[in-house]
Amino acid sequence: MRATRFPLATLKETPADAEVISHQLMLRAGMIRRLASGLYSWTPLGLRVLRKVEGLVRDEMDRAGALELLMPAVQPAELWQESGRWEQYGPELLRLKDRHMREFCFGPTHEEVITDYVRREVKSYRQLPVNYYQIQTKFRDEIRPRFGVMRAREFLMKDAYSFHVDEDSLKETYARMHEAYTRIFTRCGLDFRAVLADTGSIGGNASHEFHVLADSGEDAIAFSDVSDYAANVELAEAVAPATERAAPGEAMRLVDTPNARTIADLVEQHGLAIEKTVKTLVVAAAEGAEAPLIALLVRGDHELNAIKAEKLPQVASPLRMATEEEIRAAIGAGPGSLGPVNLPIPCVVDRAVALMSDFGAGANIDGKHYFGINWERDLALPPVADLRNVVAGDPSPDGQGSLQIRRGIEVGHIFQLGRKYSEAMGATVLDEQGRSLVVTMGCYGIGVSRVVAAAIEQNHDAQGIIWPEALAPFTVALCPINAQKSQRLREAADALYERLLNAGFEVFYDDRGLRPGAMFADMELIGIPHRLVLGERGLDAGEIEYKGRRDTDTTQVALDGVLDFLRQRMNAAH
């Protein structure tokens, strides 16, 4: 493609409202342009990258045996009312009415539509399993769209839905989708992890998220430094320490702590090591529990895990922290002075707390703490559970290595849905005995447009984007120097351009006649992996200058061998 026919819209300055590097670079490189909050137009340059991701996704989905279709983006309310999600979904569901005042929504997902399709089209167990997918624009009315296409309101998504006679069949397809996703993100050139995840509002029995590792990621993920274990921090098990509880070394004593309202205050003012302190958090108890409130105890340097906490049978779900008024009414002290000694409400302690000795905690009297508390001597050990978020250095739950914590950008999510939608909507087939059987479902999503942003977050430098080979809008940039002043150079550059095209390279031929610095800056900003620079001196020597986007130095390459040289470099990149 000639630059004179493919105008670049690069920017020198970073837009003030762009918070993350991918948003900044996509705007500066001229890949996207904002239309309204959370709505972006993809320019020809950006669309080339988007289509690359889409092509890889389609290739691997087809390879895995999925069938592509296309469903309407606008969905009738009746389907969502059947599934129960019309009432459950919040304001992120864009609802609308047609001229006949019939209610619709702009689909954020398509579970209802595909289930309706299957209950009409699939009648026998012989037609199963089947896996349908589409690549389509979705809309979610995010309360605060941000980070460019990373969290836009309108986005391109690949969503797939599989249907089965039983759980075993679902697990087979789920495993194939896991493998397909692994191939997709590997081919995209991304450093990613597949992590155990919560099924969330979509529901189901098992779930994995695929996260691209990046400092700007919104999710914290924990993974082993030895094995393939990985999980969202919220779901990673905090393994109980292998050590035994140390014997008591101090007497329990009541200490005046009038200004210690937080763990940090306690550490700073009274010299306790933070790992020798305990936080007491009071939450609403489950309906029918022995008391309306229950206390959860974690070590002072640990954080309560809300997902783990609300899965306890004693705790109300969703998790609700007690108000100060409720706490004072039940305990007689404020939140900064709570602890397990003489606590008048039930409590559960974290595994790490159960192994503590000589620790400090609130005395359930305002402005007072007990120091030197020991289980079994000063009070009985309450029920023990895994209540906390894991931290870096914790043992991996699979027994192999230690956990590392990194930020991740979720780009894919796969679910074993079970029968949630098929039961609600009556999606059945006839089994071998001619009896009606409710089908079992799986669903599998990839944020196609989000992959583009995630790739940039992971692949950039001070000059701009560094595209992985498979995602680059063009693979080779051809930059003639001062070609407007030399017909000989123009003809040589034109001839090389044709050679490159005929050899199958995706070439961006910068024939704009810009000065070299401006031309090189644009090529680095938009991230083309391979740059060829042709000048009069090189032409005389039968050479061309080569520089890879990740290289610090240039290389002189013989003009007649440049095609083979490029092929070698590209093969090495894979």
Swiss-Prot record:
- Per UniProt, what is one Pfam family of this protein? HGTP_anticodon
UniProt KW Ligase keyword:
yes
Q: Name one GO molecular function term.
A: proline-tRNA ligase activity
Give GO cellular component annotations, separated by semicolons.
cytosol
Enzyme Commission numbers on file: 6.1.1.15
Keyword list, A-Z = Aminoacyl-tRNA synthetase, ATP-binding, Cytoplasm, Ligase, Nucleotide-binding, Protein biosynthesis
Enumerate the catalysed reactions.
tRNA(Pro) + L-proline + ATP = L-prolyl-tRNA(Pro) + AMP + diphosphate
GO BP term (any one): prolyl-tRNA aminoacylation
- UniProt-annotated location(s): Cytoplasm
What is its quaternary makeup? Answer: Homodimer.
Question: Tell me, what does this protein do in biology?
Answer: Catalyzes the attachment of proline to tRNA(Pro) in a two-step reaction: proline is first activated by ATP to form Pro-AMP and then transferred to the acceptor end of tRNA(Pro). As ProRS can inadvertently accommodate and process non-cognate amino acids such as alanine and cysteine, to avoid such errors it has two additional distinct editing activities against alanine. One activity is designated as 'pretransfer' editing and involves the tRNA(Pro)-independent hydrolysis of activated Ala-AMP.
Would you identify the family this protein belongs to, as annotated? Belongs to the class-II aminoacyl-tRNA synthetase family. ProS type 1 subfamily.
Q: What is known of its domains?
A: Consists of three domains: the N-terminal catalytic domain, the editing domain and the C-terminal anticodon-binding domain.
Recorded protein name is Proline--tRNA ligase
Native source organism of the sequence: Thioalkalivibrio sulfidiphilus (strain HL-EbGR7)
State which gene encodes it.
Answer: proS
